[in-house]
């Protein structure tokens, strides 16, 4: 963190802290590989405490107490597009589950209880410690994950002096409380990935438009994240749909674009940032009628675009 802060200062970039927020996650233990493979029909258990180190299928949920709130016949989904299991029995020390949709269960992955709301604290203990550190270091940009109340925003502003709070909209509860959250926040961030775990993926385009519209009503900046340049995590070129999505998002009134996995684990993080910056620049030219005239006069070919995209290789 200190290293990042020094680099950010040199580049005159404000460093931000993103909280974990109220979310259930997996804890894989007792195995060399940090994942479990389960198939449809498999019976497995979720331990309420991660103590059995020799368990060949050792998995628990964080926070631990959440297991006591789960009832029989509820469905658990592990990560987006991951395995799904139904709770058959809730015993004193574990949940007995049956897999209904096979897949991998990774470590520290998000967990959803389908069609069932569980009230979780706004911040983990790790979050609270991180906010104290942010305050001591003078970090002023705080992103609240899974923000679902003005209480969370007030807590951050009391804990971190002069904090600029960006509330992340990524749950149904966030949408229900959107007006209050927009009113009390300094900015809004739409996480399309986590939001998809709570609402139908077909509704994401319309949720995005509605959230941006509400943020603009309160004169708050609104940013959009997830699947921005997903293809560049592994590939060398973005898709035309991705480029069009970015420009379409800007046309909706978004204040900016946020890169996540593209720069965290992608193999061309710098290129991703350059592409977004270039598109924003071209969008501004287009708004004042300059870019389209340039395209008509001197058409940029796909080959020339590839040269530009790969110039740093």
Label each residue range with its predicted role.
Residues 1-313:
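Non-catalytic helical/linker scaffolds that mediate oligomerization, partner binding
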């Amino acid at each position: 963190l200190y290293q990042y802060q020094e680099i950010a200062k040199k580049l005159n970039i404000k460093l931000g802290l993103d909280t974990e927020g109220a979310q259930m996650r997996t804890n894989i233990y007792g195995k060399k590989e940090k994942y479990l493979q389960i198939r449809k029909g498999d019976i497995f258990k979720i331990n309420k405490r991660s103590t059995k180190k020799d368990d060949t299928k050792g998995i628990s949920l964080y926070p631990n107490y959440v297991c006591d709130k789960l009832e029989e016949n509820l469905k658990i989904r592990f990560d987006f597009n991951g395995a799904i299991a139904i709770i058959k029995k809730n015993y004193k020390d574990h949940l007995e589950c049956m897999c209904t949709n096979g897949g991998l269960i990774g470590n520290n992955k998000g967990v959803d209880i389908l069609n069932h709301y569980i009230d979780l604290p706004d911040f983990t203990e790790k979050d609270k410690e991180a906010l104290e550190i942010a305050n001591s270091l003078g970090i002023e940009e705080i992103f609240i994950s899974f923000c679902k109340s003005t209480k969370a925003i007030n807590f951050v502003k009391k804990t971190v002096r002069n904090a600029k709070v960006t509330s992340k909209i990524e749950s149904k509860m966030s949408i229900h409380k959107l007006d209050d959250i927009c009113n009390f926040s300094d900015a809004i961030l739409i996480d399309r990935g986590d939001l998809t775990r709570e609402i139908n993926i077909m509704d994401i385009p319309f949720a995005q438009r509605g959230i941006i519209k509400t943020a603009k009503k309160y004169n708050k900046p609104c940013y959009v994240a997830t699947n921005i340049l997903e293809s560049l995590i592994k590939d060398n070129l973005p898709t035309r749909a991705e480029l069009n999505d970015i420009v379409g998002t800007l046309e909706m009134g978004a204040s900016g674009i946020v890169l996540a996995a593209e720069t965290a684990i992608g193999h061309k993080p710098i290129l991703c940032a350059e592409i977004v910056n270039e598109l924003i620049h071209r969008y501004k030219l287009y708004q004042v009628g300059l870019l389209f005239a340039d395209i008509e006069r001197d058409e940029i070919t796909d080959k020339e675009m590839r040269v530009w995209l790969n110039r740093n290789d």
